[in-house]
Amino acid sequence: FINRLIPHILDKEYINKKLVEADQLALKYTNDIATTTGNPILDEYFRQSYLDNFLRGGYPIVVSGSNDDKVLHLFSRKHGDPERDYNQFSTAAEFYSQGDGNFRDVLQNRRCDIIFHPEINEFDIRQFYSLVQIDGYTPMYVKACTFSVIKKHKEDVYKFLDDTVLHGKSKIISALEDRFTAGSLANVILSNNISITISIDEFLHSILDFCQQNYESSTEKVGNYIDQWDYLLDMILCYQRIYPEKIEDLIFKSKVYKYFDSDQTVKPRNEKYFFDGKKARQLDAFYVNTKKYELGYKAEDTNWLKTSSGEIYYTNLIEKLIAIIVNKIALLDPCQMGIEMEANRAGWNDACNGLPSLFGSGMSENFEVARTCHFVKDVLTKYSNHTITVPEELFELYAKVNDSIATCSSGFELWDALATARETYRDKTCYSISGQTVAMDIPDFIHSLDIYINLLSDGVIKAMQLGD
């Protein structure tokens, strides 16, 4: 087939036409950031940066509906560096094409979406904070969202198909029985020559209105990166700039967040610390937990943390923020300067890949934890009338962290106590949580945040002194 197209593709007129189309397409999508300054090169730099951003994070398209709005991120993909084979990428060969990307990369490139596209509202925040695990880590990949028909709307879907599909309805029904993407459904219609009475766009938009949107993600057998979560707070701060009047509802009232459930389990220290008589090393810091598969974990699905009764656990954003803070404080290194690289991976900088084996820690993450502490302190001080609950397992970790900080007399003793507390917590939350929650005293937690902030600040001072 491709060989037959060669004469057409090599035709100069065809090539010139495609160049014009490419320019027009780039201009269309970068008009969001069109800027006129005294320097035309700077103007084009803005456009190019914006283009590069959404070619990795995706360009948000809102599909409005009578039930709720859906958001599709067109063009999303892993960044493709020609010199690094492991950064190869692919996008689906379909309309509304989306691809998979690394969590950190996609998060980095979507964190300002709300500024250019206020119509997406809370979507990005809900997606990425839901993918944060109960241990504060995140999965490796963010995948294209899928859709599934809501059970109560099945009859509405059948009626809609009766009204709009002239023939081939059974193939569409078959496609709707499982999770699907907007593009895959369009492919079913086109590849089977199914006749519909409205445009494909109208048809897809109507179908999606009867569906729930599913966040999709997966792990890679490499461990957990220390910095995957670093840009999460930026999303909230950008949202606050656009919708300051909605920040209270965002933080406290929307109980739609879940916890991603990973098949990767971080080993306790006695299983990853090695000493050969001369040198200590931290190696093979995680394992793929096959017991989870025996309990129903599905590698091909996106798995969510469940309670002991088998129900997916839902919560609000304030709990997710608290979970991040407490887990990260429990990861302070023996000098309380940085956050430990204890799960097999460093951060984005590949030159640091050897640091986890050398018990490395990250100062950048210290700054991010401190920023998150300051933000949570501000919102809790301003909106102190809310009741905050957290899973009893998380509350127990929080209590042990505070007790350790209050009673330990040395940095190493504190590190050992914090590490023991987090290992116990991970054992209790590895497969499920009880589902029982504990109310937190807001003034007490604000006081704890002050302690954490001071501890982190002291760590920065130590690092600066060490650097001098």
Regions found by a protein language model. Name each.
Residues F1-D468:
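Acidic, mature catalytic/reactive cores of soluble proteins
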